[in-house]
Swiss-Prot record:
Protein name: Small ribosomal subunit protein bS21
InterPro entries reported for this sequence: Ribosomal_bS21, Ribosomal_bS21_CS, Ribosomal_bS21_sf
Provenance organism: Elusimicrobium minutum (strain Pei191)
Family indicated by similarity: Belongs to the bacterial ribosomal protein bS21 family.
Keywords linked to the UniProt accession: Ribonucleoprotein, Ribosomal protein
Gene Ontology CC annotations of this record: ribonucleoprotein complex; ribosome
Single Gene Ontology BP annotation: translation
A Gene Ontology molecular function term of the record: structural constituent of ribosome
Matches recorded under NCBIfam families: S21p
Biased composition (Basic residues): 55-64
PROSITE patterns the record matches: RIBOSOMAL_S21
Pfam families attached to this UniProt entry: Ribosomal_S21 (PF01165)
Length: 64
C-alpha cells in the first residue's frame, strides 16, 4: 500500500505526482491490469512460451 503525506505548503498536484510515481515504482497499476480479466492456465502457458521464443530470437540476433 502506498502512502504519501502532503507536506506543508505543498500543492495537491505535486503530492498527486509523488503518489503516481510511488504507484509506478511498486507496480500497482501493472498488477491491476494483470488481474482485470481471468486468463486460463493454458493461455498463460502459451504467452509464457511466446515470450521465451521472443527472448531467444533477440539473444540470437545480439550474438551475431
Amino acid at each position: 500500500m502506498v502512502f504519501v503525506k502532503v507536506r506543508d505548503a505543498e500543492h495537491l498536484e505535486e503530492a498527486l505526482k509523488r503518489f503516481k510515481r510511488e504507484c509506478e515504482k511498486n507496480g500497482i497499476l501493472k498488477e491491476i491490469k494483470r488481474r482485470e480479466t481471468y486468463m486460463p492456465p493454458s493461455v498463460k502457458r502459451k504467452i509464457k512460451s511466446q515470450e521465451a521464443q521472443r527472448r531467444m530470437r533477440r539473444t540470437k540476433r545480439k550474438r551475431f
